[in-house]
Design a protein with these regions (language model features):
Chain A
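Short, Lys/Arg-rich, polar N-terminal cytosolic tail immediately upstream
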Residues: 1-21
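A structural signal for multi-pass alpha-helical bundles of membrane permease subunits
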Residues: 22-304
């Protein structure tokens, strides 16, 4: 950056030493964070990879297990089901939430200052509450006998269902809940990006006779693309880590109907204490997220 | 003009409908927490629970019942019917007591107060630490040139992509071997090492003019003094945003705390709420009272610092 790094790297060792000594204060400033980072992030990350190739015994040493943990991960029915459930959950909720956030933000943007502030708060407020709270209240709302949800869908002629207790509805109950939680971050980011789109673009389109919808499709949506890419990546990553709702609302059940990857990691590691296997599962999760992020980034960035 | 206002009405009503859906669960937390849980009719024959009611009661029934008894008590007093008046007065105080009984049981039969305090102090300790350490690191990474700067920065940033679940197992072993299991250190230390703030602070510090820092140096200020009295005050908006997000993350953090905490008096609020639910699966008045207590502080923080939330989100997001 700005050529300074190039000159540092091209210097001889002596120059580096001199520069390090001269800048000792910079290293002192970095010391607390760097120490914490190394101990509680860098080492555990490397260790997780090592553990995934080991058979971990609580007493006694660790034995190398080669790829056997990974083989058990991919052979296990539970993991396959967890991967499938997590994928369905992500594939439905992420596009839905990003698109509704875009529409909501576009509608809000057309309003005056006061109304903008009100709706922005109304949509962001539920997201500051912990998922623990949201999951607890939705478990109550999905109650078969007294739940609000069955009551409300009754207005539209639907029969009451034991949403969380049946294996054919439990995953959908979790999905519907996620769809009805507003994507507050998305709405706020979209609103911020919309206000930076130049007015002259819209003026030019108006002169060309474009209507509101055409302007939205041809100007607003393409101009918001960087935000869309970011939001899709952000919510996909978050979605693949879904856990709190699962442990508080279904415990992964009935059967494996709502098992997700992180809930399975939790069970494997901290209920069954199979550390090697849990580490392998989490490494697999990491690569899944990495690959999906790269693919999404490329796909969404393709035409630019 | 007319067409315009119809369009606007449509937009506003659509958004209002959407916000009702979005706010309904939070409303339901508060409504259930204050719902009458057992209520006797005037003939004393039937005890009703308005919590478990089908169809559900849409607001705390104590409110209309209270005023009904109040009216009847007034009437009885007017007619000098002392027995009736006392009965209705007693019912009024019973209704108040029952309405808030969920909260009372949380504090008397469970350690809600302790959980609240634990969450609060851990949140504050972590937030202060993160603000200090991350702004120090962000400052030198943005403004100083020294060997290894880029390597350190990219090393830190590259781990932001790694899902935190990857480190669960090694961290568990480490915390156990360090003897920190079932202590608050097991929460505080890992939370202090989160790297997002370094990235945010570095972005923010870039916008501080170099001239100011140079001027302080020429005036003979030490590195620490320059950071403390020139850089930090200029970074206040960034610090506010980072502080709020750190506090919110710690306050809501769940997966790691349920793994490392075992003693009820050490629980944070989310962990306490989970054990509360495990022990009282169908007592929704109690559960919603707990949820309400956990939700209130974040709602207040949000309403006061709304501006900083927006700022933090847009800072952390796309800046292209």
């Amino acid at each position: 950056m700005k050529g300074t790094n190039a000159s540092i790297t091209s210097n001889k060792n002596k120059g580096v030493w001199h520069s390090m000594k001269k800048n000792y204060a910079a290293y002192l400033f970095l010391l607390p964070k760097l120490t914490l980072f190394i101990v509680f992030i860098a080492i555990p990350v490397v260790w997780a990879f090592i553990l995934s190739f080991q058979e971990y015994q609580i007493i006694g040493g660790n034995e190398w297990a080669g790829l056997s943990n990974y083989l058990s991960v991919f052979e296990s029915e539970a993991f396959k089901k967890a991967l499938l459930n997590t994928t369905i959950y992500t594939a439905v909720t992420v596009p839905f939430n990003v698109i509704t956030a875009l529409i909501a933000a576009s509608l809000i943007h057309s309003l005056g200052r006061f109304a903008q502030g009100f709706f922005r708060a109304a949509f962001y407020l539920p997201t500051v509450a912990s998922m623990v709270i949201i999951a607890m209240v939705w478990r109550w709302m999905y109650n078969y006998e007294f739940g609000l949800f069955n009551y409300v869908i009754g207005w539209f002629g639907f029969e009451p269902l034991n949403w969380l207790g049946q294996s054919n509805t439990a995953l959908w109950a979790i999905i519907i809940m996620q769809m009805l939680i507003p994507f507050g971050v998305g709405i706020i980011l979209y609103l911020a990006s919309m206000s930076s789109i130049s007015e002259s673009l819209y003026e030019a389109a108006t002169i060309d006779g474009a209507n509101a919808l055409q302007k939205w499709v041809k100007i607003t949506v393409p101009m918001l693309k960087p935000s869309t890419v970011y939001l899709v990546l952000l919510s996909t990553i978050g979605s693949f880590q879904v856990f709190t709702q699962i442990i508080l609302m279904t415990g992964g059940g009935p059967g494996y109907a709502t098992e997700t990857i992180v809930h399975l990691i939790y069970k494997t590691g901290f209920r069954d204490f199979e550390f090697g296997l849990a580490a392998a599962q989490s490494v697999v999760l990491f690569f899944i997220i990495l690959v999906i992020s790269i693919l999404q980034y490329r796909a969404l960035r393709h035409d630019e | 003009m007319r067409k315009f206002s119809i369009k606007k009405t449509l937009i506003v009503s659509l958004l209002l409908l959407f916000s009702i859906v979005s706010l309904l669960p939070l409303y339901w937390v508060f409504s259930t927490s204050l719902q009458l849980s057992s209520y006797q009719d005037d003939d004393l024959e039937r005890t009703t629970s308005y919590v478990n009611a089908n169809p559900p009661k849409m607001y705390p029934m104590g409110i209309p019942e209270y005023f009904e008894h109040w009216g009847k008590a007034r009437e009885a007093e007017k007619n000098d019917d002392l027995e009736q008046a006392t009965y209705h007065r007693d019912m009024m105080s019973y209704i108040v007591e029952d309405t808030f009984s969920g909260f009372k049981r949380l504090f008397s039969q469970n350690s809600m107060g302790m959980w609240f305090f634990n969450s609060l102090y851990i949140g504050i300790v972590v937030t202060v630490g993160v603000l200090l350490f991350d702004s120090m690191a962000g400052y030198v990474l943005a403004k100083k040139r020294f060997p290894g700067r880029n390597i350190i920065f990219w090393l830190i940033i590259s781990t932001m992509m790694i899902p935190s679940q990857v480190t669960l197992v090694p961290m568990f072993i480490m915390v156990r071997d360090l003897g920190l299991m079932d202590t608050h250190w097991a929460l505080i230390l890992p939370d202090l090492s989160m790297v997002f703030g370094v990235f945010l602070m570095r972005q923010f510090m870039y916008s501080i003019p170099d001239e100011l820092i140079e001027a302080a140096k020429i005036d003979g200020a030490s590195e620490w003094r320059t950071y403390w009295s020139i850089v930090l005050p200029l970074a206040k908006p960034g610090l506010a945003a980072l502080g709020i997000f750190t506090f919110m993350n710690v306050w809501n953090s769940f997966l790691w705390p349920i793994i490392v905490l075992n003693s009820a008096n050490l629980y944070t609020l989310p962990v306490g709420l989970k054990t509360l639910q495990d022990a009282n699966l169908a007592d929704f008045k109690l559960l919603m009272s707990g949820a309400a207590i956990a939700a209130i502080p974040m709602i207040i923080v949000f309403l006061i610092f709304q501006r900083h939330f927006v700022k933090g989100l847009t800072l952390g997001g796309v800046k292209e």
